[in-house]
Design a protein with these regions (language model features):
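Basic helix-turn-helix/winged-helix DNA-binding cores
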Residues: 1-68
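Short, charged amphipathic alpha-helical surface segments
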Residues: 59, 71, 77-109
Length: 109
């Protein structure tokens, strides 16, 4: 069981997860990465160390171009064929975008 003393402030979690405080608030608002505890009086968010894995997955999915709704769905499907299929589809999309960009570059050269 995680105790209150084990939880990290949003700033600490931001540093460790490499997600900005602004994005952590955004992900909380969209239900993607909800803090382990929110103080009822101050509204301060606290995160559990185990949530760093979710944060890493969110960062990686965002970095490959997926949006909040896709990230939310994929986190729920982690470890399933849906996860693998979605990443394969995103890979194909990125390859197509790269091909199109190369064609546009050839018009300049």
């Amino acid at each position: 069981m995680v105790t209150h003393t084990d939880l990290m402030t949003i700033g600490e979690f931001s540093s460790l997860s490499r997600l900005s405080v602004r994005m952590l608030r955004h992900y909380d608002a969209h239900g993607v990465l909800v803090p382990e505890h929110v103080d009822a009086h101050s509204g301060y968010r606290r995160y559990a160390p185990a949530q760093l894995r979710d944060a890493a997955d969110i960062r990686n999915l965002r970095d490959v171009g997926l949006g909040v709704s896709a990230i939310t769905a994929l986190l729920a499907a982690r470890g399933t064929s849906t996860w693998t299929d979605a990443l394969a589809l995103q890979r194909c999309t990125l390859v197509e975008e790269l091909h199109a960009a190369r064609e546009r570059l050839s018009l300049i050269d």
